[in-house]
């Protein structure tokens, strides 16, 4: 009986988990893992990761101080949160984790370099070596130039949102560690453009793109690794067996694990080296010319950057809401303690109706067990109801 497809694939390709979900990574035990803003934003809304969010927000508030504005707290927390998830992932995988630079910096070389250095600094502060982290950067001309600088500093880069052959060539010439061509998104574009429902097997345009890039890299001896990404079905994965790396979602990993069939290696360095190919070189103008001519790559890169920017904006909103709740709790705890201290005139740990400085109606509302006295928890419970109402109000803004 043949082994399952996942086991066979691991014998010829490095399997990477494409998820921000720590539990999924633990289930499939990949060598590496990749994350992106959309995955982290999704994970941030799952109850099992609430402690990571809360701990990060509290830590940043402590670091920046009580007077720091909410915007500064949230901006810093996003960087720290990406690294916090990365650290949890690195406790599971033996290899590398990819952490993405803010997509809003995709056309700013210097800002991308600065952000990458900061992220690596956060990892190093936590005791993680540089060789265990890949900094994900969009494959714009500006992003590729940033990666070229970072690679010379020993900061390894994963160039993402790669759709065109010209992007792959520029990345190889820049000496980046790894690229992530988006197989499924390329397929999506051609299906919409052509009106076809499917492109089976080797006809899949995304598969053809990765195959072309892989063969070119191996033919001309580029060290840059090719990691196929964004798969829509296991057929695409089967057609790219032998690629350096493939980053695969948990759902497709499970489907591969449940499928027993013989897996044939499709990509091979020896075959690539035997091909007749022409080597090309790109400067900024030639890159721009080719990018403009490749409508699919042009549109999908723009769409991908906008999508990741939207995910970051959403994450910022979620963190602002959560910070308001966390800091509201602290305020209410303090307020309850202050009110209790003022009213507990004899210091016996209770406030009687005679000691209460407010109205009888409020006292009766707080005295839930109707024993004629209030403790600090009674006050906190009453204020807590107000807090919950405030939290719901913030969530609807």
Swiss-Prot record:
Active site positions: 136
Function according to Swiss-Prot or TrEMBL: Transaldolase is important for the balance of metabolites in the pentose-phosphate pathway.
InterPro entries with a match to the protein in the record: Aldolase_TIM, EF-hand-dom_pair, EF_Hand_1_Ca_BS, EF_hand_dom, TAL/FSA, Transaldolase_1, Transaldolase_AS
Keyword tags: Cytoplasm, Pentose shunt, Schiff base, Transferase
Localization terms from the record: Cytoplasm
Family recorded in the similarity comment: Belongs to the transaldolase family. Type 1 subfamily.
Assigned EC number: 2.2.1.2
Annotated protein name in UniProt: Transaldolase
Organism lineage: Bacteria, Bacillati, Cyanobacteriota, Cyanophyceae, Synechococcales
Subunit annotation: Homodimer.
Main location: cytoplasm
GO cellular component, one term: cytoplasm
GO BP annotations listed: carbohydrate metabolic process; pentose-phosphate shunt
Entry-linked Gene3D superfamilies: Aldolase class I, EF-hand
UniProt keyword Cytoplasm, yes or no: yes
Superkingdom, taxonomy of origin: Bacteria
GO MF, one example: calcium ion binding
Reactions listed under catalytic activity: D-sedoheptulose 7-phosphate + D-glyceraldehyde 3-phosphate = D-erythrose 4-phosphate + beta-D-fructose 6-phosphate
Pathway assigned to this chain's UniProt record: Carbohydrate degradation; pentose phosphate pathway; D-glyceraldehyde 3-phosphate and beta-D-fructose 6-phosphate from D-ribose 5-phosphate and D-xylulose 5-phosphate (non-oxidative stage): step 2/3
């Amino acid at each position: 009986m043949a082994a399952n497809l996942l086991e066979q694939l691991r014998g010829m390709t490095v399997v990477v988990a494409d998820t921000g979900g720590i539990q999924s990574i633990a289930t499939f035990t990949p060598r590496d893992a990749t994350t992106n803003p959309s995955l982290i934003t999704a994970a941030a809304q799952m109850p099992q990761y609430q402690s990571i969010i809360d701990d990060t927000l509290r830590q940043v508030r402590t670091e920046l101080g009580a007077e720091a504005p909410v915007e500064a707290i949230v901006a810093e927390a996003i960087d720290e949160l990406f690294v916090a998830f990365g650290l949890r992932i690195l406790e599971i995988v033996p290899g590398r984790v990819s952490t993405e630079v803010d997509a809003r910096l995709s056309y700013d070389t210097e800002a991308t370099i600065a952000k990458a250095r900061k992220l690596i600094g956060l990892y190093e502060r936590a005791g993680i070596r540089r060789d265990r982290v890949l900094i994900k950067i969009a494959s714009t001309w500006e992003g590729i130039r940033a990666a070229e600088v970072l690679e010379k500093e020993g900061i390894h880069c994963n160039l993402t949102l790669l759709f065109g052959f010209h992007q792959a060539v520029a990345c190889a010439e820049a000496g980046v560690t790894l690229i992530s061509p988006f197989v499924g998104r390329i397929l999506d574009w051609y299906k919409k453009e052509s009106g076809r429902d499917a492109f089976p097997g080797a006809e899949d345009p995304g598969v053809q793109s990765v195959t072309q890039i892989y063969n070119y890299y191996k033919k001309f001896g580029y060290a840059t690794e090719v990691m196929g990404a964004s798969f829509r079905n296991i057929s695409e994965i089967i057609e790219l067996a032998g690629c350096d790396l493939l980053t695969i979602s948990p759902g497709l990993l499970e489907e591969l694990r449940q499928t027993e069939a013989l897996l044939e290696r499709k990509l091979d360095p020896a075959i690539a080296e035997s091909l007749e190919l022409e080597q090309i070189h790109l400067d900024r103008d030639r890159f721009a010319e080719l990018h403009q001519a490749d409508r699919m790559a042009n549109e999908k890169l723009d769409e991908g950057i906008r999508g990741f920017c939207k995910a970051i904006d959403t994450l910022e909103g979620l963190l602002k809401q959560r910070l308001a709740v966390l800091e509201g709790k602290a305020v209410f705890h303090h307020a309850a303690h202050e009110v209790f201290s003022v009213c507990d005139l004899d210091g016996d740990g209770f406030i009687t109706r005679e000691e209460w400085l407010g109205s009888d109606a409020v006292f009766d509302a707080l005295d839930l067990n109707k024993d004629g006295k209030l403790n600090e928890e009674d006050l906190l419970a009453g204020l807590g109801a107000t807090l919950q109402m405030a939290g719901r109000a913030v969530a609807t803004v």
